[in-house]
Amino acid sequence: MAMIIALQARQILDSRGNPTVEVEALLDDGSFGRAAVPSGASTGEFEAVERRDGDKKVYQGKGVLDAVHAVDEELEQVVVGLDASDQRAVDQAMLELDGTDNKAKLGANAILGASMAIARAAASSADLPLYKYLGGPNAHVLPVPMMNILNGGSHADSNVDIQEFMIAPIGAPTFSEALRWGVEVYHSLKSVLKDRGLSTGLGDEGGFAPNLESNAAALDLILEAIDKAGYKPGRDIALALDVASSEFFDKGTYTFEGKKRSAEEMSAYFADLVEKYPLVSIEDPLDEDDWKGWATLTEHIGDKVQLVGDDLFVTNPERLARGIQEGVANALLVKVNQIGSLTETFDAVELAQRNGYRCMISHRSGETEDTTIADIAVAVNAGQIKTGAPARSERVAKYNQLLRIEEELGDAATYAGASAFPRFAAK
Protein backbone atom coordinates (compact mmCIF):
# COMPACT_ATOMS: atom_id res chain seq x y z
CA MET A 1 0.00 0.00 0.00
CA ALA A 2 1.54 3.28 -1.15
CA MET A 3 0.38 6.61 0.22
CA ILE A 4 -0.02 9.81 -1.78
CA ILE A 5 2.48 12.40 -0.56
CA ALA A 6 2.18 15.16 -3.17
CA LEU A 7 0.20 16.52 -6.11
CA GLN A 8 1.52 19.20 -8.43
CA ALA A 9 -0.23 20.73 -11.45
CA ARG A 10 0.87 22.98 -14.28
CA GLN A 11 -0.63 24.71 -17.29
CA ILE A 12 0.42 23.13 -20.60
CA LEU A 13 -0.91 23.38 -24.18
CA ASP A 14 -3.26 21.01 -25.99
CA SER A 15 -3.27 20.17 -29.70
CA ARG A 16 -5.26 23.29 -30.59
CA GLY A 17 -2.85 25.61 -28.79
CA ASN A 18 -5.20 26.10 -25.85
CA PRO A 19 -4.11 25.74 -22.22
CA THR A 20 -4.97 22.57 -20.33
CA VAL A 21 -4.08 20.99 -17.00
CA GLU A 22 -1.28 18.50 -16.38
CA VAL A 23 -0.95 16.87 -12.95
CA GLU A 24 1.83 14.87 -11.30
CA ALA A 25 1.29 12.57 -8.33
CA LEU A 26 4.03 11.28 -6.02
CA LEU A 27 3.71 8.32 -3.63
CA ASP A 28 5.69 7.53 -0.49
CA ASP A 29 7.47 4.60 -2.18
CA GLY A 30 8.83 6.95 -4.85
CA SER A 31 6.28 5.99 -7.50
CA PHE A 32 5.24 8.77 -9.83
CA GLY A 33 2.37 9.39 -12.26
CA ARG A 34 1.66 12.16 -14.75
CA ALA A 35 -1.53 12.87 -16.70
CA ALA A 36 -2.87 15.61 -18.97
CA VAL A 37 -6.51 16.52 -19.48
CA PRO A 38 -8.21 16.82 -22.92
CA SER A 39 -10.80 19.40 -24.00
CA GLY A 40 -13.71 19.26 -26.47
CA ALA A 41 -14.89 21.54 -29.33
CA SER A 42 -18.48 20.31 -29.57
CA THR A 43 -19.41 19.94 -25.91
CA GLY A 44 -22.60 18.56 -24.44
CA GLU A 45 -24.72 20.90 -22.33
CA PHE A 46 -24.65 18.42 -19.45
CA GLU A 47 -20.89 17.84 -19.30
CA ALA A 48 -18.94 18.46 -16.10
CA VAL A 49 -17.57 22.01 -15.94
CA GLU A 50 -14.16 22.71 -17.39
CA ARG A 51 -12.69 25.53 -15.32
CA ARG A 52 -11.18 28.40 -17.33
CA ASP A 53 -9.74 31.64 -15.94
CA GLY A 54 -11.77 34.00 -18.14
CA ASP A 55 -9.09 36.72 -18.33
CA LYS A 56 -9.42 37.82 -21.98
CA LYS A 57 -5.92 39.35 -21.91
CA VAL A 58 -4.33 35.95 -21.25
CA TYR A 59 -4.84 33.09 -23.72
CA GLN A 60 -8.10 34.82 -24.78
CA GLY A 61 -9.68 33.83 -21.48
CA LYS A 62 -8.83 30.14 -21.83
CA GLY A 63 -6.11 29.95 -19.19
CA VAL A 64 -6.42 27.20 -16.55
CA LEU A 65 -4.34 28.61 -13.70
CA ASP A 66 -7.37 28.59 -11.39
CA ALA A 67 -7.70 24.83 -12.00
CA VAL A 68 -3.95 24.41 -11.45
CA HIS A 69 -4.24 26.24 -8.11
CA ALA A 70 -7.24 24.06 -7.19
CA VAL A 71 -5.00 20.99 -7.55
CA ASP A 72 -2.02 22.47 -5.73
CA GLU A 73 -3.85 24.20 -2.90
CA GLU A 74 -7.09 22.26 -2.37
CA LEU A 75 -7.12 18.79 -3.90
CA GLU A 76 -3.65 17.94 -2.61
CA GLN A 77 -4.79 18.56 0.97
CA VAL A 78 -7.61 15.98 0.79
CA VAL A 79 -5.67 13.21 -0.99
CA VAL A 80 -2.31 13.33 0.79
CA GLY A 81 -2.16 10.36 3.16
CA LEU A 82 -4.69 8.29 1.20
CA ASP A 83 -3.90 4.87 -0.25
CA ALA A 84 -3.27 5.51 -3.95
CA SER A 85 -4.60 2.07 -4.89
CA ASP A 86 -8.07 2.89 -3.52
CA GLN A 87 -9.17 4.92 -6.55
CA ARG A 88 -12.78 5.16 -5.42
CA ALA A 89 -11.81 6.62 -2.03
CA VAL A 90 -9.39 9.06 -3.66
CA ASP A 91 -11.95 10.27 -6.19
CA GLN A 92 -14.68 10.44 -3.57
CA ALA A 93 -12.54 12.69 -1.38
CA MET A 94 -12.07 15.09 -4.29
CA LEU A 95 -15.75 15.00 -5.28
CA GLU A 96 -16.83 15.74 -1.71
CA LEU A 97 -14.44 18.69 -1.55
CA ASP A 98 -15.95 20.07 -4.76
CA GLY A 99 -19.48 19.48 -3.49
CA THR A 100 -21.31 20.25 -6.76
CA ASP A 101 -23.10 17.93 -9.20
CA ASN A 102 -21.03 19.12 -12.16
CA LYS A 103 -17.65 19.93 -10.57
CA ALA A 104 -18.28 23.65 -11.03
CA LYS A 105 -16.33 24.66 -7.91
CA LEU A 106 -12.93 23.09 -8.55
CA GLY A 107 -13.32 22.11 -12.21
CA ALA A 108 -13.50 18.73 -13.90
CA ASN A 109 -10.13 19.49 -15.49
CA ALA A 110 -8.54 19.76 -12.03
CA ILE A 111 -10.21 16.67 -10.56
CA LEU A 112 -9.68 14.47 -13.62
CA GLY A 113 -6.03 15.42 -13.92
CA ALA A 114 -5.45 14.40 -10.31
CA SER A 115 -7.56 11.24 -10.67
CA MET A 116 -5.60 10.00 -13.70
CA ALA A 117 -2.17 10.97 -12.33
CA ILE A 118 -2.84 9.11 -9.08
CA ALA A 119 -3.98 6.00 -11.02
CA ARG A 120 -0.77 6.10 -13.05
CA ALA A 121 1.32 6.42 -9.89
CA ALA A 122 -0.55 3.50 -8.28
CA ALA A 123 0.02 1.36 -11.39
CA SER A 124 3.72 2.18 -11.24
CA SER A 125 3.78 1.27 -7.53
CA ALA A 126 2.12 -2.07 -8.32
CA ASP A 127 4.61 -2.61 -11.17
CA LEU A 128 1.75 -3.10 -13.61
CA PRO A 129 0.96 -1.51 -16.96
CA LEU A 130 -1.95 0.91 -16.59
CA TYR A 131 -4.44 -1.22 -18.57
CA LYS A 132 -3.77 -4.23 -16.36
CA TYR A 133 -3.85 -2.18 -13.17
CA LEU A 134 -7.22 -0.68 -14.10
CA GLY A 135 -8.75 -3.75 -15.71
CA GLY A 136 -7.23 -6.74 -13.96
CA PRO A 137 -6.02 -9.99 -15.54
CA ASN A 138 -8.97 -10.21 -17.95
CA ALA A 139 -8.01 -7.01 -19.82
CA HIS A 140 -7.06 -8.40 -23.23
CA VAL A 141 -9.35 -7.06 -26.00
CA LEU A 142 -7.77 -4.64 -28.46
CA PRO A 143 -10.33 -2.16 -29.80
CA VAL A 144 -11.43 -1.49 -33.36
CA PRO A 145 -9.90 1.89 -34.26
CA MET A 146 -12.75 4.18 -35.38
CA MET A 147 -10.60 6.44 -37.52
CA ASN A 148 -11.98 9.88 -38.27
CA ILE A 149 -10.54 10.37 -41.74
CA LEU A 150 -12.90 13.06 -43.04
CA ASN A 151 -14.06 16.03 -40.96
CA GLY A 152 -17.08 18.32 -41.25
CA GLY A 153 -19.25 20.20 -38.77
CA SER A 154 -17.48 22.12 -36.00
CA HIS A 155 -14.20 20.27 -36.66
CA ALA A 156 -13.80 21.83 -40.12
CA ASP A 157 -14.60 24.90 -42.19
CA SER A 158 -16.79 23.29 -44.87
CA ASN A 159 -20.46 22.88 -45.77
CA VAL A 160 -20.63 19.25 -44.65
CA ASP A 161 -22.97 19.03 -41.63
CA ILE A 162 -21.86 15.67 -40.22
CA GLN A 163 -18.89 16.22 -37.94
CA GLU A 164 -16.95 12.98 -38.41
CA PHE A 165 -16.80 10.32 -41.11
CA MET A 166 -14.96 7.30 -39.75
CA ILE A 167 -13.66 3.98 -41.03
CA ALA A 168 -13.73 0.83 -38.90
CA PRO A 169 -11.40 -1.99 -40.04
CA ILE A 170 -13.70 -4.77 -38.80
CA GLY A 171 -12.26 -7.54 -40.99
CA ALA A 172 -8.66 -7.31 -39.81
CA PRO A 173 -7.22 -10.25 -37.81
CA THR A 174 -5.26 -8.12 -35.31
CA PHE A 175 -5.13 -4.54 -34.06
CA SER A 176 -1.81 -3.88 -35.78
CA GLU A 177 -3.26 -5.06 -39.10
CA ALA A 178 -6.41 -2.98 -38.51
CA LEU A 179 -4.23 0.07 -37.97
CA ARG A 180 -2.32 -0.66 -41.18
CA TRP A 181 -5.55 -1.04 -43.16
CA GLY A 182 -6.85 2.24 -41.77
CA VAL A 183 -3.60 4.07 -42.56
CA GLU A 184 -3.64 2.76 -46.13
CA VAL A 185 -7.22 3.96 -46.65
CA TYR A 186 -6.30 7.34 -45.13
CA HIS A 187 -3.46 7.79 -47.63
CA SER A 188 -5.69 6.49 -50.41
CA LEU A 189 -8.31 9.12 -49.52
CA LYS A 190 -5.65 11.84 -49.73
CA SER A 191 -4.81 10.65 -53.23
CA VAL A 192 -8.52 10.59 -54.24
CA LEU A 193 -8.97 14.15 -52.95
CA LYS A 194 -5.87 15.38 -54.79
CA ASP A 195 -7.06 13.77 -58.04
CA ARG A 196 -10.30 15.75 -57.76
CA GLY A 197 -8.60 19.02 -56.94
CA LEU A 198 -10.05 19.02 -53.41
CA SER A 199 -8.33 20.33 -50.28
CA THR A 200 -6.16 17.95 -48.29
CA GLY A 201 -5.98 20.32 -45.31
CA LEU A 202 -6.56 18.67 -41.94
CA GLY A 203 -9.29 19.24 -39.34
CA ASP A 204 -8.80 19.26 -35.56
CA GLU A 205 -8.57 15.47 -35.35
CA GLY A 206 -6.29 14.81 -38.32
CA GLY A 207 -8.98 14.01 -40.87
CA PHE A 208 -9.21 15.76 -44.20
CA ALA A 209 -11.64 18.67 -44.42
CA PRO A 210 -12.54 19.26 -48.08
CA ASN A 211 -15.44 21.47 -49.07
CA LEU A 212 -17.99 18.97 -50.43
CA GLU A 213 -21.52 19.46 -51.70
CA SER A 214 -23.18 16.93 -49.39
CA ASN A 215 -22.76 14.35 -46.66
CA ALA A 216 -23.38 11.54 -49.17
CA ALA A 217 -20.50 12.89 -51.29
CA ALA A 218 -18.21 12.42 -48.28
CA LEU A 219 -19.34 8.80 -47.83
CA ASP A 220 -18.88 8.10 -51.54
CA LEU A 221 -15.33 9.48 -51.46
CA ILE A 222 -14.45 7.19 -48.55
CA LEU A 223 -15.90 4.14 -50.33
CA GLU A 224 -13.75 5.03 -53.34
CA ALA A 225 -10.69 5.32 -51.08
CA ILE A 226 -11.40 1.91 -49.50
CA ASP A 227 -11.65 0.33 -52.97
CA LYS A 228 -8.51 2.09 -54.16
CA ALA A 229 -6.59 0.77 -51.14
CA GLY A 230 -7.60 -2.78 -52.10
CA TYR A 231 -10.22 -3.45 -49.43
CA LYS A 232 -13.89 -4.38 -49.62
CA PRO A 233 -16.34 -1.93 -48.02
CA GLY A 234 -18.51 -3.65 -45.43
CA ARG A 235 -16.51 -6.87 -45.26
CA ASP A 236 -13.03 -5.47 -44.53
CA ILE A 237 -13.73 -1.89 -43.60
CA ALA A 238 -17.07 -0.44 -42.47
CA LEU A 239 -18.16 3.18 -42.06
CA ALA A 240 -19.26 5.14 -39.00
CA LEU A 241 -20.52 8.67 -38.34
CA ASP A 242 -20.52 11.25 -35.59
CA VAL A 243 -23.35 13.59 -36.54
CA ALA A 244 -23.04 15.92 -33.49
CA SER A 245 -26.60 17.01 -34.26
CA SER A 246 -26.94 19.26 -31.19
CA GLU A 247 -24.68 21.65 -33.13
CA PHE A 248 -27.43 22.30 -35.71
CA PHE A 249 -30.55 21.79 -33.55
CA ASP A 250 -32.59 24.79 -32.47
CA LYS A 251 -36.14 25.15 -31.13
CA GLY A 252 -37.26 21.67 -32.05
CA THR A 253 -35.85 21.51 -35.58
CA TYR A 254 -32.63 20.42 -37.26
CA THR A 255 -31.09 22.65 -39.94
CA PHE A 256 -29.43 19.94 -42.00
CA GLU A 257 -28.27 20.03 -45.63
CA GLY A 258 -29.88 23.45 -45.98
CA LYS A 259 -33.35 22.34 -44.85
CA LYS A 260 -35.31 22.49 -41.61
CA ARG A 261 -36.05 18.91 -40.54
CA SER A 262 -38.04 17.27 -37.75
CA ALA A 263 -36.74 14.35 -35.67
CA GLU A 264 -38.89 12.03 -37.80
CA GLU A 265 -37.33 13.38 -41.00
CA MET A 266 -33.83 13.00 -39.54
CA SER A 267 -34.64 9.42 -38.53
CA ALA A 268 -35.84 8.63 -42.05
CA TYR A 269 -32.63 10.15 -43.44
CA PHE A 270 -30.45 7.90 -41.25
CA ALA A 271 -32.55 4.81 -41.99
CA ASP A 272 -31.94 5.49 -45.68
CA LEU A 273 -28.19 5.90 -45.12
CA VAL A 274 -28.03 2.58 -43.25
CA GLU A 275 -29.68 0.88 -46.24
CA LYS A 276 -27.33 2.47 -48.77
CA TYR A 277 -23.97 2.33 -46.98
CA PRO A 278 -22.09 -0.23 -44.83
CA LEU A 279 -22.57 1.79 -41.63
CA VAL A 280 -21.87 0.12 -38.29
CA SER A 281 -22.26 3.11 -35.97
CA ILE A 282 -23.97 6.52 -35.82
CA GLU A 283 -23.13 8.83 -32.93
CA ASP A 284 -25.43 11.63 -31.76
CA PRO A 285 -27.84 11.44 -34.72
CA LEU A 286 -30.32 13.54 -32.70
CA ASP A 287 -30.13 16.33 -30.12
CA GLU A 288 -28.98 15.69 -26.56
CA ASP A 289 -32.45 16.50 -25.20
CA ASP A 290 -34.58 14.91 -27.93
CA TRP A 291 -35.36 11.81 -25.84
CA LYS A 292 -38.57 11.05 -27.71
CA GLY A 293 -36.86 11.28 -31.10
CA TRP A 294 -34.02 9.08 -29.87
CA ALA A 295 -36.45 6.41 -28.62
CA THR A 296 -38.24 6.34 -31.99
CA LEU A 297 -34.97 6.16 -33.91
CA THR A 298 -33.65 3.36 -31.67
CA GLU A 299 -36.82 1.36 -32.16
CA HIS A 300 -36.65 1.94 -35.92
CA ILE A 301 -33.00 1.12 -36.72
CA GLY A 302 -31.36 0.11 -33.40
CA ASP A 303 -31.29 -3.54 -34.53
CA LYS A 304 -29.39 -2.60 -37.70
CA VAL A 305 -26.76 -0.15 -36.50
CA GLN A 306 -25.02 0.98 -33.33
CA LEU A 307 -26.55 4.24 -32.04
CA VAL A 308 -24.08 5.99 -29.76
CA GLY A 309 -24.97 8.56 -27.11
CA ASP A 310 -22.28 11.19 -26.62
CA ASP A 311 -23.84 14.60 -25.87
CA LEU A 312 -26.94 12.58 -24.93
CA PHE A 313 -25.26 10.68 -22.07
CA VAL A 314 -22.05 12.73 -21.43
CA THR A 315 -20.51 9.65 -19.74
CA ASN A 316 -22.91 10.30 -16.85
CA PRO A 317 -24.37 7.22 -15.11
CA GLU A 318 -27.60 9.08 -14.25
CA ARG A 319 -28.31 10.13 -17.84
CA LEU A 320 -27.31 6.68 -19.08
CA ALA A 321 -29.71 5.04 -16.60
CA ARG A 322 -32.52 7.16 -18.03
CA GLY A 323 -31.56 6.10 -21.55
CA ILE A 324 -31.60 2.43 -20.59
CA GLN A 325 -35.00 2.86 -18.93
CA GLU A 326 -36.49 4.61 -21.99
CA GLY A 327 -34.92 2.37 -24.65
CA VAL A 328 -32.74 5.16 -26.01
CA ALA A 329 -29.55 4.41 -28.02
CA ASN A 330 -27.64 1.15 -27.66
CA ALA A 331 -24.09 2.34 -27.02
CA LEU A 332 -22.22 4.81 -24.81
CA LEU A 333 -19.43 7.12 -25.90
CA VAL A 334 -16.93 7.34 -23.06
CA LYS A 335 -15.03 10.61 -22.58
CA VAL A 336 -13.21 10.87 -19.27
CA ASN A 337 -13.43 14.66 -19.11
CA GLN A 338 -17.21 14.72 -19.63
CA ILE A 339 -17.71 13.27 -16.15
CA GLY A 340 -14.37 14.26 -14.62
CA SER A 341 -13.03 11.29 -12.64
CA LEU A 342 -11.86 7.75 -13.37
CA THR A 343 -14.24 6.18 -10.84
CA GLU A 344 -17.31 7.79 -12.39
CA THR A 345 -16.06 6.86 -15.87
CA PHE A 346 -15.75 3.20 -14.88
CA ASP A 347 -19.16 3.31 -13.18
CA ALA A 348 -20.71 4.51 -16.46
CA VAL A 349 -18.94 1.77 -18.45
CA GLU A 350 -20.02 -0.90 -15.98
CA LEU A 351 -23.65 0.26 -16.10
CA ALA A 352 -23.59 0.27 -19.91
CA GLN A 353 -22.04 -3.18 -20.25
CA ARG A 354 -24.34 -4.68 -17.63
CA ASN A 355 -27.32 -3.54 -19.70
CA GLY A 356 -26.06 -4.69 -23.09
CA TYR A 357 -24.88 -1.28 -24.28
CA ARG A 358 -21.59 -1.19 -26.15
CA CYS A 359 -18.87 1.28 -25.16
CA MET A 360 -16.64 3.36 -27.41
CA ILE A 361 -13.73 5.02 -25.63
CA SER A 362 -13.07 8.48 -27.06
CA HIS A 363 -10.56 11.29 -27.30
CA ARG A 364 -11.51 14.99 -27.55
CA SER A 365 -10.69 17.42 -30.34
CA GLY A 366 -8.27 19.23 -27.99
CA GLU A 367 -5.84 16.43 -27.06
CA THR A 368 -2.35 15.97 -25.65
CA GLU A 369 0.29 13.27 -25.83
CA ASP A 370 -1.40 11.55 -22.84
CA THR A 371 -2.33 7.94 -23.71
CA THR A 372 -4.59 7.04 -20.76
CA ILE A 373 -7.63 6.39 -22.97
CA ALA A 374 -5.77 3.68 -24.91
CA ASP A 375 -5.19 1.81 -21.64
CA ILE A 376 -8.80 2.37 -20.56
CA ALA A 377 -10.07 0.87 -23.83
CA VAL A 378 -8.19 -2.37 -23.13
CA ALA A 379 -8.86 -2.27 -19.37
CA VAL A 380 -12.64 -2.45 -19.90
CA ASN A 381 -12.47 -4.63 -23.05
CA ALA A 382 -14.49 -1.93 -24.81
CA GLY A 383 -13.79 -3.26 -28.29
CA GLN A 384 -13.92 0.24 -29.83
CA ILE A 385 -11.79 3.38 -29.61
CA LYS A 386 -12.22 6.72 -31.32
CA THR A 387 -9.03 8.71 -31.35
CA GLY A 388 -8.82 10.46 -34.68
CA ALA A 389 -7.02 9.97 -37.96
CA PRO A 390 -3.61 8.30 -38.16
CA ALA A 391 -2.06 11.79 -38.34
CA ARG A 392 -1.05 14.43 -35.78
CA SER A 393 1.05 13.05 -32.97
CA GLU A 394 -1.55 13.59 -30.22
CA ARG A 395 -3.81 11.10 -32.10
CA VAL A 396 -1.08 8.68 -33.18
CA ALA A 397 0.22 8.50 -29.57
CA LYS A 398 -2.90 6.50 -28.62
CA TYR A 399 -2.53 4.11 -31.56
CA ASN A 400 1.15 3.58 -30.76
CA GLN A 401 0.27 2.79 -27.14
CA LEU A 402 -2.24 0.17 -28.35
CA LEU A 403 0.48 -1.38 -30.52
CA ARG A 404 2.68 -1.67 -27.41
CA ILE A 405 -0.17 -3.21 -25.41
CA GLU A 406 -0.90 -5.74 -28.17
CA GLU A 407 2.77 -6.71 -28.28
CA GLU A 408 2.94 -7.05 -24.49
CA LEU A 409 -0.21 -9.23 -24.35
CA GLY A 410 1.16 -11.52 -27.05
CA ASP A 411 -1.02 -14.57 -27.66
CA ALA A 412 -3.48 -13.38 -24.99
CA ALA A 413 -4.45 -10.38 -27.15
CA THR A 414 -7.79 -10.55 -28.97
CA TYR A 415 -8.82 -8.05 -31.63
CA ALA A 416 -12.51 -7.16 -31.33
CA GLY A 417 -13.10 -6.83 -35.09
CA ALA A 418 -16.65 -7.37 -36.33
CA SER A 419 -17.68 -8.79 -32.92
CA ALA A 420 -17.62 -5.21 -31.60
CA PHE A 421 -20.76 -4.56 -33.66
CA PRO A 422 -23.11 -7.51 -33.12
CA ARG A 423 -26.06 -5.71 -34.71
CA PHE A 424 -24.29 -5.27 -38.02
CA ALA A 425 -24.57 -7.87 -40.78
CA ALA A 426 -22.22 -7.09 -43.66
CA LYS A 427 -24.11 -6.60 -46.89
Curated annotation (Swiss-Prot):
Key words of the record: Cytoplasm, Glycolysis, Lyase, Magnesium, Metal-binding, Secreted
Residues that coordinate or bind Mg(2+): 242, 283, 310
The EC number(s) this enzyme carries: 4.2.1.11
GO molecular function, one term: magnesium ion binding
Cofactor note: Binds a second Mg(2+) ion via substrate during catalysis.
Single GO BP term: glycolytic process
Protein's cellular compartments: Cytoplasm; Secreted; Cell surface
Active site per database record: 205 (proton donor), 335 (proton acceptor)
Disulfide linkage: none
Pathway of action: Carbohydrate degradation; glycolysis; pyruvate from D-glyceraldehyde 3-phosphate: step 4/5
SUPFAM superfamilies according to UniProt: Enolase C-terminal domain-like (SSF51604), Enolase N-terminal domain-like (SSF54826)
UniProt xrefs under CDD domains: enolase (cd03313)
The protein's required cofactors: Mg(2+)
Catalytic function, reaction form: (2R)-2-phosphoglycerate = phosphoenolpyruvate + H2O
PANTHER family recorded: ENOLASE (PTHR11902:SF1)
Protein role: Catalyzes the reversible conversion of 2-phosphoglycerate (2-PG) into phosphoenolpyruvate (PEP). It is essential for the degradation of carbohydrates via glycolysis.
Entry protein name: Enolase
